[in-house]
Amino acid sequence: MPRRTDIKKVLLIGSGPIQIGQAAEFDFSGSQACKSLREEGIEVVLVNSNPATIQTDPETADTIYIEPLRASIIAKIIEKEKPDGILSGMGGQTGLNLTAELAELGALRNVEILGTPLEAIYQGEDREKFKALMQKIGEPVPRSMILNRLDQLGEVIEKVGLPVIIRPAYTLGGAGGGIAHTVDELKRIVEIGLQRSRIHQVLIEESVMGWKELEFEVMRDAKDTCVIICSMENVDPMGVHTGESVVVAPILTLRDDEYQMMRSASIKIIRALDVQGGCNIQFAFQDGDYRVIEVNPRVSRSSALASKATGYPIARVAAKIAIGMHLDEITNAVTGCTPASFEPSIDYVVVKVPRWPFDKFTRADRTLTTAMKSTGEVMAIGRTLEEGFKKALRSIDTDINTHTNHNEIRMILTSPTDERFGCIFDAFREGFTVDEIASLTSINPFFLHKMENIVKIERTLATEPTDLRIQEAAAAGFSMKEIAELTGRPVDEVRTAAGDPVYKMVDTCAAEFPATTPYYYSTHGVTTDIIQNDKKKVLILGSGPIRIGQGIEFDYCTVHAVKALREEGVEVHIVNNNPETVSTDFDTSDQLFFEPMQLEDVVNILKTDDYFGVMVQFGGQNAVNLALPLLQEIKKLGLPTAILGSSPDAMDIAEDRDRFSELLDALKIPSPPNSSAYSEEAALAMANKIGFPVLVRPSYVLGGRAMEIVHDNFELESYMKEAMRVSKSHPVLIDSFLQEAIELDVDAVCDGDEVLIGGIMEHIEEAGVHSGDSACVIPTQSLSDSVLARVREYTKKIAMGLGVVGLVNIQLAVKDDIVYVLEANPRASRTVPFVSKATGIPLAKVAAKVMIGKKLKDLGYKERTFRHVAVKEVLLPFNKLPGVDTVLGPEMKSTGEVMGIDYDFGRAYYKACISADNELPIEGNVFISVSTEQKEEVRRIAAQLRDLGLTLFGTKGTVETLMQAGIEANLVRKVQEGSPNVIDMVRKGEIRLIINTPVDKQSRLDHYQIMRAAVDYGIPYITTLQAARAAALAIDAIKREKITLEPISHYLSEVE
């Protein structure tokens, strides 16, 4: 049937900040859904707390609220906007949970849940109901028991036995779950799982570890038409969360009759659940037998992968189904001529590999279980599985350690960690057999034989470096650089022997029909599908997998650059390998290349056409690092392509501390005393000359990797080893650390003649906390007009001095009324989306236009003033990564961000804290423990909290300090002093807020245990006095005045 005419206005709930288990895939699906609904003339109201999303752009939805994703707040938005329907399945687990909560609140009495009905959500998410439904329709599930209380553990052990898998209901990325082999492990995981579950329910399930894990992505409409979009197979067996596993599409290890059995089961399950839209179904399979593991009655991480793997726009189709359309009425937008009821067909192999944050968190537990730890993923496409594996490993952009010790290899293979996939290749190099590795890993021998083939090719290249062998290696996904190293032949000679790659098309139909929105992958030995034209073309380098320090913000900038260039009539191509993002959606660019982001891959694309230019400044640090080598290759090959925007030399000046210091001296701009060193000895000499404490950091790295504040020679010696390791060919930078300074960020655009300042952000955290981890506010709250005038002056001088064309981010610090410049980055920064949303200036779009020759004076933008206050706060991943130090410092740890907006700082900060899952209490008990040097300052904060009606608790030193000032506080034991202590109070739910600022080693040890408890039990915690001061202001504001609930357009309409 045609779309329903009674649905005129739809509310879509976004997924909030990027976090482990819920990344950019929901911006991709939500944006696609908004576009799909508006194509049908439906008004879309969107609510999301994440400013770094395309879906919160003014052109994506009709009305946009950047507000905390809380049922009570969304209920008020529903009351105000009066939508006819709500679309819950595009916001991930967050969207589903909120829809269920809104229904339970009674907020959906006059609002229809579109697509998948509420009962299907309950049956898919509530473990007990799901198990009952599967048993009713005769589908096998693992032997299991539902738990709601800890005292049921004895019964579990009796009925299910050990080991078991624990799966909490209504949680994200397996959060709170795990595998228990002992009673103690079971008790610990269940306690946290019950806490994390929205309905305090966990499923205890018999272990099917070692079985194959299979996934089917299914689509169904109201007419009961079902299509299988994609089948996927995890290389890692059951026991590793699918988000943590290497995944292959399509399924390659089942016989046809087995595949048809699983296909039929998938359709039977989606029909029983009455899902209308997309649905992901996971199975365990072994020797012709299977178990249904779980169902996601929504678009998911796997949906994004299936969508990109096949070219089938799952979210677009699901949104149209939600408003009553049938699959045979919906046109496949990729082909433009086939209906969405045609099942996709693919003639290639897709490989997904997760990206883990262990390069940042070296002390974290690296074991892979049923709870997610990865931050992002890459996707590679090849004609063979070998080619897919090799291209995926090149895409992942992380150091892969080599192992030669056989005992070490056996240990890694037996216990799954992030190192296991790479270590399998080491095992083959060391002579292990397929059977040995299969018995250690339970990985299907089919995959192991393919991996063994790759190692055999390596050996053949070394012993027989002929042109034929080189061509075979190129077809198997080996890079030219790798082949050159293995053969001992020069790279240029290898390239000539291998020949240039060709590009094949992803079109949903194995080339049966022509595609109108093509995207491509490279391979060797076949004909190319690329069709050239005479249009002016630009290639934009994407940002690759989401990782700490390089998140969705850079994809946001990439998409904005595409839109800006297309507005100017330029044909835009993107190269990226992240299946979760909007930039890799089928219709974002004119052409998309799903490729590794290495130099030779980018150069190969440039050789396919006469590109006018290539843009590197929107893809984050990794893309910027390619600027100089890319320029050299372009010159060497005589390509007609320019690096658009700021020159590679300008980028080098900004990264090279000596050159940048010379520029600041020439411009008469103050900077902290600093130097650079290539050795430990030189670093010690420089640090002693500058004076401790100093900030040590490698150059040309992202997110403050290996950055530390060091206080003496001993600490410096330790940290230099890590700094030299991550930045081998570049100097280590040493800066005097400005204690108690106020840190600032400025985002600006320069066209070579003029500078547009987008926004000046004041950090809420102290100097020394990485800018990516600090909350910040626009406009600034504590700086004088004279200081801000100097900030503007220095920004303009540096932009002009560097010769910036495009974006520039400048970090500054203010101490004793002196403005110091810390660093400049002539590229997109992670704060660009926040500044753009807070001010209404689309900085990335402006920058892209400037980079192709437009002038700021003609574009009509100027720095703006406004009545509202916007606060950016970060989301930290400590609840997903046991073992990580929770103290904030100069190395970035956050995964995502949120924005709070209101008419004063207190309410804006309160909203930001709620959005970041750090809900500040307006009543109850507060625990405070600070260092001796901070006692004076904490008195003022404690007095304010007391006056606001909160009850204070603290350790001995802090309590004595407060009592001396006449502030009543209750004494609590330190952790090492035994029970009862603050951790016991946290477990009992007696503490509502923790303020703990550790300094020495013992207080850090206490702090870690306290923060770990806070994370596990969902208690807000604060680790700096600046944030504590801001929290007190927020609690004060929220007790005096209600938060404002207005769309972002309302605030921006008042901008001057």
Curated annotation (Swiss-Prot):
<dbReference type="GO" id="GO:0004088">
    <property type="term" value="F:carbamoyl-phosphate synthase (glutamine-hydrolyzing) activity"/>
</dbReference>
<dbReference type="InterPro" id="IPR005480">
    <property type="entry name" value="CarbamoylP_synth_lsu_oligo"/>
</dbReference>
<comment type="pathway">
    <text>Amino-acid biosynthesis; L-arginine biosynthesis; carbamoyl phosphate from bicarbonate: step 1/1.</text>
</comment>
<feature type="region of interest" description="Carboxyphosphate synthetic domain">
    <location>
        <begin position="1"/>
        <end position="397"/>
    </location>
</feature>
<protein>
    <recommendedName>
        <fullName>Carbamoyl phosphate synthase large chain</fullName>
        <ecNumber>6.3.4.16</ecNumber>
        <ecNumber>6.3.5.5</ecNumber>
    </recommendedName>
</protein>
<feature type="binding site">
    <location>
        <position position="294"/>
    </location>
    <ligand>
        <name>ATP 1</name>
    </ligand>
</feature>
<comment type="similarity">
    <text>Belongs to the CarB family.</text>
</comment>
<feature type="domain" description="MGS-like">
    <location>
        <begin position="918"/>
        <end position="1056"/>
    </location>
</feature>
<dbReference type="GO" id="GO:0046872">
    <property type="term" value="F:metal ion binding"/>
</dbReference>
<dbReference type="GO" id="GO:0005524">
    <property type="term" value="F:ATP binding"/>
</dbReference>
<keyword id="KW-0460">Magnesium</keyword>
<dbReference type="InterPro" id="IPR033937">
    <property type="entry name" value="MGS_CPS_CarB"/>
</dbReference>
<feature type="binding site">
    <location>
        <position position="239"/>
    </location>
    <ligand>
        <name>ATP 1</name>
    </ligand>
</feature>
<feature type="region of interest" description="Carbamoyl phosphate synthetic domain">
    <location>
        <begin position="531"/>
        <end position="919"/>
    </location>
</feature>
<feature type="binding site">
    <location>
        <position position="294"/>
    </location>
    <ligand>
        <name>Mn(2+) 1</name>
    </ligand>
</feature>
<feature type="binding site">
    <location>
        <position position="282"/>
    </location>
    <ligand>
        <name>Mn(2+) 1</name>
    </ligand>
</feature>
<feature type="binding site">
    <location>
        <position position="241"/>
    </location>
    <ligand>
        <name>ATP 1</name>
    </ligand>
</feature>
<feature type="binding site">
    <location>
        <position position="823"/>
    </location>
    <ligand>
        <name>ATP 2</name>
    </ligand>
</feature>
<dbReference type="Pfam" id="PF02142">
    <property type="entry name" value="MGS"/>
</dbReference>
<feature type="binding site">
    <location>
        <position position="811"/>
    </location>
    <ligand>
        <name>Mg(2+) 3</name>
    </ligand>
</feature>
<feature type="binding site">
    <location>
        <position position="811"/>
    </location>
    <ligand>
        <name>Mn(2+) 3</name>
    </ligand>
</feature>
<feature type="binding site">
    <location>
        <position position="823"/>
    </location>
    <ligand>
        <name>Mn(2+) 4</name>
    </ligand>
</feature>
<feature type="binding site">
    <location>
        <position position="208"/>
    </location>
    <ligand>
        <name>ATP 1</name>
    </ligand>
</feature>
<dbReference type="GO" id="GO:0044205">
    <property type="term" value="P:'de novo' UMP biosynthetic process"/>
</dbReference>
<keyword id="KW-0479">Metal-binding</keyword>
<feature type="binding site">
    <location>
        <position position="771"/>
    </location>
    <ligand>
        <name>ATP 2</name>
    </ligand>
</feature>
<keyword id="KW-0067">ATP-binding</keyword>
<feature type="binding site">
    <location>
        <position position="769"/>
    </location>
    <ligand>
        <name>ATP 2</name>
    </ligand>
</feature>
<dbReference type="GO" id="GO:0005737">
    <property type="term" value="C:cytoplasm"/>
</dbReference>
<feature type="binding site">
    <location>
        <position position="823"/>
    </location>
    <ligand>
        <name>Mg(2+) 3</name>
    </ligand>
</feature>
<feature type="binding site">
    <location>
        <position position="743"/>
    </location>
    <ligand>
        <name>ATP 2</name>
    </ligand>
</feature>
<feature type="binding site">
    <location>
        <position position="282"/>
    </location>
    <ligand>
        <name>Mg(2+) 1</name>
    </ligand>
</feature>
<keyword id="KW-0547">Nucleotide-binding</keyword>
<feature type="domain" description="ATP-grasp 2">
    <location>
        <begin position="661"/>
        <end position="852"/>
    </location>
</feature>
<feature type="domain" description="ATP-grasp 1">
    <location>
        <begin position="131"/>
        <end position="323"/>
    </location>
</feature>
<feature type="binding site">
    <location>
        <position position="770"/>
    </location>
    <ligand>
        <name>ATP 2</name>
    </ligand>
</feature>
<dbReference type="InterPro" id="IPR011761">
    <property type="entry name" value="ATP-grasp"/>
</dbReference>
<dbReference type="GO" id="GO:0004087">
    <property type="term" value="F:carbamoyl-phosphate synthase (ammonia) activity"/>
</dbReference>
<dbReference type="GO" id="GO:0006526">
    <property type="term" value="P:L-arginine biosynthetic process"/>
</dbReference>
<comment type="subunit">
    <text>Composed of two chains; the small (or glutamine) chain promotes the hydrolysis of glutamine to ammonia, which is used by the large (or ammonia) chain to synthesize carbamoyl phosphate. Tetramer of heterodimers (alpha,beta)4.</text>
</comment>
<feature type="binding site">
    <location>
        <position position="294"/>
    </location>
    <ligand>
        <name>Mg(2+) 2</name>
    </ligand>
</feature>
<feature type="binding site">
    <location>
        <position position="127"/>
    </location>
    <ligand>
        <name>ATP 1</name>
    </ligand>
</feature>
